[in-house]
């Protein structure tokens, strides 16, 4: 067993860049351990991930704000505080804040993350209309 004591582990909040659009900050809760990584992620309005998938899936727990999650080939689904999302292994998706709200979620990522192309402004607008 390991216990990770929040900010005591010395991890700093990180500005996320090349695999995100807009301003996104991640606060590492648990470093990659046994193929599991946990981050609290803050998205400014309209900010979002690129398309990606996870080798063993991902769990999102929305803690504040409003946002969207979109699976390839489908319309985006709204996210609100209190929502929990299970994304199966290798399912291509993106998630991020609504255009008029920030979004804060805890991301529990299982296995390797396969980062892909950016979600364009037109794709974001079309999926969330």
Predicted regions and their residues:
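A short hydrophobic beta-strand segment most commonly corresponding to one strand
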Residues: 59, 86, 100-118
């Amino acid at each position: 067993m390991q216990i990770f004591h929040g900010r005591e582990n010395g991890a700093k909040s990180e500005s996320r860049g090349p695999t995100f659009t807009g301003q996104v900050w991640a606060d590492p809760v648990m470093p990659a351990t046994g193929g599991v990584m946990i981050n609290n992620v803050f998205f400014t309005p309209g900010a979002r991930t690129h398309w990606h998938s996870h080798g063993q899936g991902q769990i999102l727990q929305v803690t504040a704000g409003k946002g969207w999650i979109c699976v390839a080939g489908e319309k985006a689904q709204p996210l609100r505080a209190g929502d929990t999302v299970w994304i199966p292994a290798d399912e291509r998706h993106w998630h991020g804040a609504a255009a008029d709200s920030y979004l804060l979620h805890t991301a529990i990522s299982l296995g390797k993350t396969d980062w892909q192309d950016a979600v364009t402004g037109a794709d974001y607008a079309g999926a969330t209309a």
